[in-house]
């Protein structure tokens, strides 16, 4: 491993100190808790939506979450290893065949639904152990 890769790995480990990032993929519904600073107050804001893209670039990894707010589509890009992220919770697994779900931008209502990925009983039992 070269020097830059080592430094990047150290920064990732430092960013993950004390928190875990779950495995998630495009199509999954996630709740991202973000630390927001307003003046001298600090609070946690939840942002729930569907992951439409994931970009794996080491320390520069990011993902885009899309939600419908008051009838309008809202997308937000999060840096995976940002210190502003308090936590990420996977609420629902989506069953999709694409890595980038940008086509959801043009769709609304029933056509924008994503099938739920059902886990077999064998895998569910193995995951809990």
UniProtKB/Swiss-Prot annotation:
GO molecular function, one term: structural constituent of ribosome
The keyword Ribonucleoprotein is assigned to this record: yes
Example GO BP: translation
Record key words, sorted: Ribonucleoprotein, Ribosomal protein
Matches recorded under Pfam families: Ribosomal_L19 (PF01245)
Entries under SUPFAM superfamilies matching the protein: Translation proteins SH3-like domain (SSF50104)
PROSITE patterns in alphabetical order: RIBOSOMAL_L19
One term under GO cellular component: cytosolic large ribosomal subunit
Keyword Ribonucleoprotein set for record: yes
Residue ranges that the Swiss-Prot or TrEMBL entry lists as coiled coil: none
NCBIfam families from the UniProt entry: rplS_bact
Record's function text: This protein is located at the 30S-50S ribosomal subunit interface and may play a role in the structure and function of the aminoacyl-tRNA binding site.
Annotated family: Belongs to the bacterial ribosomal protein bL19 family.
PANTHER family: LARGE RIBOSOMAL SUBUNIT PROTEIN BL19M (PTHR15680:SF9), RIBOSOMAL PROTEIN L19 (PTHR15680)
Protein name: Large ribosomal subunit protein bL19
Organism (species): Burkholderia mallei (strain ATCC 23344)
């Amino acid at each position: 491993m070269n020097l830059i890769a080592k430094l990047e790995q150290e920064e990732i480990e430092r960013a993950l100190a004390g928190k875990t990032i779950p495995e998630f993929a495009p199509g999954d519904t996630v709740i991202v808790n973000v630390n927001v600073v307003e003046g001298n107050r600090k609070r946690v804001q939840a942002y729930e939506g569907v992951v439409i893209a994931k970009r794996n670039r080491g320390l520069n990894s990011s993902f885009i979450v899309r939600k419908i707010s008051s009838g309008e589509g809202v997308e937000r890009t999060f840096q995976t290893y940002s210190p502003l992220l308090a936590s990420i919770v996977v609420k629902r697994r989506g069953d999709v065949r694409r890595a980038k779900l940008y086509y959801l931008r043009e769709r609304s209502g029933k056509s924008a639904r994503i099938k739920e990925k059902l886990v077999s009983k064998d895998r569910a039992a193995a995951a809990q152990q």
